[in-house]
């Protein structure tokens, strides 16, 4: 599903004063639900320490008064979610939910809102379901997969600076598998054609061309809304260049993803036609 990332606000040290919200989703009606979120309006509070029921009460109601930020979420029939680095049992999880509901029980409309608690195990499980996020997390904690990278600026200039995607209306791309006479595309039309193919799943696309014409930049633009609307989900993207000598190999990583029924979009740069055939 499409991610509503343009409607997400976050920033700052999670230990800093934040009014009870570290990350906020404020999506138009239906956009959050369509993107896989429980509600269109969500407030996330992130805690590095364990959160007992008494801690939850104090967090949501400092000095015995419900935080205005949480009250606003309830009035919008949204969701309030606490994410903790601690690991909890099933009994502790339900105790945490009860504590959250009790803390907000005096607010009108609380029964139409949603409260949830994410512990470290639940966060890890979600991360493992999204290969692009796995690559990003491992990179951030200093344990990257050799040669594999999450979505980022894969294509850089000779000076090491990011390149903007440059589009024009001239035909730049051709599809040799299309027997129709009209098989030439502008860059944006080509992006949309490749996106459509990749969304089907269980398929592959080989981008061929002379060195330096922008093949990697084109592949990066597949995941960029700024390059063309209706981009692919960047959290699914996992990138490598064969010159990085990736471990695991592209074939091994693909086998693992298939065995675990995990959805991902692998981009293998500078791969041979034989490797493409194998994949």
Q: What are the language-model segments listed below?
A:
Residues 185-199:
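Pre-Walker A adenine-sensing motif
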Residues 200-219:
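Walker A/P-loop nucleotide-binding motif
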Residues 236-247, 253-279:
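Conserved P-loop NTPase "ATPase switch" module shared by AAA+ and STAND
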